Amino acid sequence: MNSDQENINSYNFESIKIGDYKCNVNRIPGDNLYLLSNFNDAEPKYDDKNGVHLEFNYKKIGESKTMRLNDGATSTVLIEGARNMNANEYFPKFVEKKKSFAEHLIRKTFAKGYESPSEIQALVVPELIQRKDTLIQFKSGTGKTHAFLFGCLWGFDPDDDVLQYIFITSSHEVATQIYEQAVFLLPETAKIALCIGQKKSPNSFGNSGFKTPIGTSSLNHKPKSIKEEREEIRQAQIIICTMGRFYDILCNKGWITTTRYLKAICVDEFDNIVASKTKQRSSTVMNTEDQMAEIIQKIESEAPKNSENGAQRVFFSATVSPYAIKIANSYFRKYSPIIGEPFIVLLDSEDYTLEGIRQYYVQCSNYFEKKEIILDLLKQCRIAQAIIFANRIETANEIKKLLDEQEVPISSAVFHGDLPAVTRKNIHKDFVENKIRLLISTDLTSRGLDVQGINVVFNFDMPDTLETYIHRVGRSGRYGRKGVSISLILVNQNKNEMEKVEQIDNCSKQSKMSQLPGDLSTLL
């Protein structure tokens, strides 16, 4: 952990290694660290000695650990007459009801293809089940989406019609991926709303020839009128959304009746949302950091006055800046015996980049040489699927034009934030389904895009920050697969981007950048 990360100096951090990852985890001295070795162990049990608990069986070492569930975890379901029950009456009923849902969640997890928990899932799921506030930094492509969905939604009650969970992320495409995974995991009766911005279509006409009001969100992948959209949001048990759109429906439109019974607010790509260096498009639009602060404030103001729980705060990101750590600390709930200390995981500062990804660079003297080299690389590399990253929309468009003019035989599309939402959605869908093999993209796809077929990432332009580089590179080599990144480095009298190569190498003990070899036949 570096000196900047240590600005949370009130916590005790312990250095641990889980799998191939070295992490710094805050622990109270003497407190147990529970690791989920099998998803079946998330099924709750009850006995007089341990109360409601999870039993973790570590077959490899022939040991087991019992994690007693706290009051926050055991208050996540509606049970008729619960107020008049004592603990011996309530807990067996809780376990009976929660066990049924947990079995469903576990069964769907196996059906999704997860045979055993990944490192991040093993580390984080037990703490999320205990409803701990969390700040989790872990590398891309390690299963973090399933970690926060499984851990948070363990507390979901299908019979409770109130808004229980909010999942926020930074882009339409990532929100859609989270939504689709949540729909797969949960019972069909669960009311889940996908709430993302969508430009109005100029060709939407009713039978009379006049334009029909269309909601600016896409709920359940179907166009909705504003009235239909508002009603679905009001009835939702779970909302999965982009930051700006959620702020609009909560703070501006007031479509969410109450957050009083909210169990958790989970923010993916937290660092990007609260510490983004992206300039605002308009001075009249709040940045996402200010929107996040107002959302947290509103949730706190609506929480029951006599409640020690409140909404759990869950923050995930592949990179975490010192400023994001400071903001997360200010959002965490105040300590109480029920809530406990927040659970914070920070990667070792000297090993941020993904293992399994071979990183190469090619020196270029100017923009025109870059264009020649990218054409050569596309002809020589055996590409399953790939992304070419550019820093500007204009550059992305020029690359696409170049590929079309040169008739490069790889299906491709340009992808950036100025495209209409429907166009972005269709391109994203075609890329996921491998109908498009190559995206020429701005940093819109650098975070959270989960396409397992990507085996190479090209940096046509080097990004401005190390964090963005890490996110870009993380699009390949997903879930332990092998991947390659190739960066075009400008070296001339005016600019020497080899300094960025040195910075990348300084932040990774095991994975270094090297000059691209002449023979690319064995590269992929």
Curated annotation (Swiss-Prot):
The UniProt record lists the keyword Hydrolase: yes
Organism: Acanthamoeba polyphaga mimivirus (APMV)
CDD domains registered for this protein in UniProt: SF2_C_DEAD
Record's function text: Putative ATP-dependent RNA helicase.
Protein name according to UniProt: Putative ATP-dependent RNA helicase R458
SUPFAM superfamilies (alphabetical): P-loop containing nucleoside triphosphate hydrolases
GO molecular function, one term: nucleic acid binding
Protein family (similarity comment): Belongs to the DEAD box helicase family. eIF4A subfamily.
Binding positions (ATP): F138, K139, S140, G141, T142, G143, K144, T145
Xref: Pfam families: DEAD, Helicase_C
Keyword set, alphabetical order: ATP-binding, Helicase, Hydrolase, Nucleotide-binding
